[in-house]
Structures are given as C-alpha cells and as structure tokens.
C-alpha cells in the first residue's frame, strides 16, 4: 500500500471525524460503542488519523485534555472530496471475518459436540451486542444530522444479530450434543 492510498479503514476514520472533529481516543470510543464495527486494532485508531493528516485529508490541532494536551482532527477539503469520491463508487461486500463460521469450518476436525456448545455460547455475546445497539439508538437522537443514517445502520446490525441467532438455533438442532 502506498502511503497516500485510502483504505476502507481510512474512510471509516474520515467518517467518524465527521462535521465536528474528534481525537483519536474519541474515534476508538465511537467504534467500540457498537462493538461489531470495531474491527481494526486499537493502535490503528491512533496511527491512521496521523497518517491521514500527514497527507492532507485531516487537519490536526492541539487542545487541552483532561490530563494532557490532545490532538483533535477535523476534515479538510481534501478529506471531504475523498469521501465524496468514495461515496460515488459501487458498494461491494467486504470479506467477512466470523468466529462462528470458522467453528463450522473446523467442525469435522474437532467434533460436533464441542462446536455445538461453542456456538450455543454465542447467545450471551449476541445479547451483549444487542444491548449496545439499543444504547446506540438512544445516542443517535443526539446526532440529528446523522440520526436517520445511524438508524438504518443499527437496523442492519440487528438483522445480522438475528442471523447469528438463527445459526445458533440451527446448530442446536442439527449438530449432535
């Protein structure tokens, strides 16, 4: 990857910075709130904004923080143009990273009972993520300029959780215990 290339994660950072700007810690917090969308390593939420700023997609300024100065990033015209250009490209399904699907891949090697038990344990995680989505729905009200789009996203994520619940139910029915 060239140092000027924008990745899916780059666009995520530009989108999270949004209209009002954000520090790296804010970006990580926003990504973690829903948990399902925090797919990058923690350090990337600190290094990618710096990289984007060095290439002119973000502007960086220092502000007083709770314990020390913090860097706040805002979109530049180049960053807005990059988002506008990206928005015009066709949407593709990105590769899916799924622990549940990996368990099914190795089921013939490790056995159905252990795979079934592992998949059934997913219910607790589904409940946790679903609760986070409900909290995100409440937070969406505080962002009127994004509320409509956040609600579409959250509805999609609820659907993904529904699919996980269906997978767990099928595993319970079809795999031996």
Per-range role (PLM):
Residues 1-95:
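Basic helix-turn-helix/winged-helix DNA-binding cores
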Residues 134-154:
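Acidic interhelical loop/turn segments
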Residues 84-131:
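Amphipathic alpha-helical dimerization/coiled-coil segments
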Residues 29, 54, 135-138, 170:
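Regular, well-ordered alpha-helical segments
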Residues 24, 52, 126, 158-168:
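Alpha-helical transition-metal enzyme core signature, strongest for iron centers
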Residues 175-177:
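Long amphipathic alpha-helical coiled-coil segments
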């Amino acid at each position: 990857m060239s140092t000027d290339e924008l990745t899916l994660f780059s666009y995520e950072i530009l989108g999270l910075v949004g209209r009002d700007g954000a520090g790296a810690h804010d970006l990580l917090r926003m990504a973690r709130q829903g948990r399902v969308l925090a797919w990058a390593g923690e350090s990337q939420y600190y290094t990618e904004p710096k990289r984007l700023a060095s290439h002119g997609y973000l502007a960086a300024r220092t502000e007083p923080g709770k314990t020390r100065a913090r860097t706040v990033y805002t979109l530049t015209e180049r960053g807005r143009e990059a988002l506008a250009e990206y928005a015009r490209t066709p949407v593709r399904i990105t590769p899916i990273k799924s622990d549940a699907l990996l368990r099914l891949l190795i089921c013939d090697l490790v056995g159905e009972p252990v795979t079934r038990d592992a998949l059934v344990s997913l219910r607790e995680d589904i409940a946790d993520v679903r609760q986070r989505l409900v909290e995100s729905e409440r937070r969406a009200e505080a962002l009127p300029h994004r509320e409509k789009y956040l609600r579409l996203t959250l509805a999609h994520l609820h659907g993904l959780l529904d699919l996980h619940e269906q997978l767990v139910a099928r595993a319970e029915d079809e795999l031996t215990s």
